[in-house]
Amino acid sequence: MATMTDPPVEGFRLSQLIYDTRYRSMTIQVVAFILIMLGLVWLANNVVTNLQALGKDFDFGFLGNRAGYDINQRLVEYSNDSTHGRAAIVGILNTLLVAVLGCITATILGVFAGVLRLSKNWIVSRLMGVYVEGFRNIPLLLWILVIFAVMTEGTPQPRDFRGEDAEASMILGDSVAITNRGIYIPNLVFNRSLGGNEVDAETGAVVASQSAGDMILLLVVIIAGFVASGFIGRRATAIQEKTGVRPPGTFWMRLGAVIVPALIVLVALGATLEYPELRGFNFADGIHLRNSLIALWFALSLYTGAFIAEIVRAGIMAVSKGQTEAAFALGMRPSWTMNLVILPQALRVIIPPLISQFLNLTKNSSLAIAVGYMDVRSTLGGITINQTGRELEGMLLLGLFYLITSLIISGAMNIYNNSVKLQER
């Protein structure tokens, strides 16, 4: 029973959804969500209607059809009799290959360029400035074409390596050949495969048919070694923080955790190096890095490295000058100051924008078609769509690949960023 002191009961009115601040934001969000869903339903209905008008259906069965085209640069077995799904896998691996190589070299180049741009040496600083401004302000596609032209027109032909008075010669102890058809480097061959070897009936030679699986095993062992090395390093750091003394031999233990297991696997698999050799009109054996891969890799590295250099420079400048002065007051060398004091603190500023550069490099690799490098854009998003007419399914798969790859890169880098950021109480 209500009394004279009870507050009046306010009834709900529809106008409150707009004028009452307690409900307004929720109302706007619900309306926006409904409009977006209606738009997606309209688009889906429009696509279905158009497909029916063209006599098409939505199906991914084309991935099992014969591809009928060749891919020159590949990491796994492939022929023109393989399926479109196999071609897509080859393209995905080619994309990941150039993305990983590009991220590594761009980071190394960007760190060096960013540090050297802050050098007190006028010539070094200005040279790095020219590099950064030059590559940042010229389109990436142009650099890809320029490097590709230099590789094809400015390097010797394989026939120039022939004869006693050859015009060209191999480098690094006759193990690497740079030609207008690409770069030939030694190949790691396993003579004792864990999956069993095939023996040539005529020659009795061992064919390492399981080399792909053996290489995966080697990579897994190396990654596990790095994980163990990181655990040893963290354990040593914890002991040092507790006792003030770092355990002796930590560096060699970390190094051994990576090298020793890898060497054991290499010896167990009978690993040897297969060197490129000139036979007839071209080089045989070894690994052939084609000009398309080299041009794309170098261009992505140089272009993205210029942006990373500015990120590194900004991160270093964000660290208080007092840190440098304190390090010098303790008698530390400039190189030690940069490696042990400045860069570890600058990482907190560098990592977030660095994630965006890694994502940009991965997506910029789709320009590979300009020089004939068969990445996933060229295979699944190019030739496969042209042959099958499945443009909707192909583009959906292509977009899904780039989405998943970007999320993985972003997630991994965010985990690393959380490990280096300042821990507050």
Question: Residues of each region from the PLM?
Answer:
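Transmembrane alpha-helices and adjacent helix-loop boundaries
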Residues: 2-425
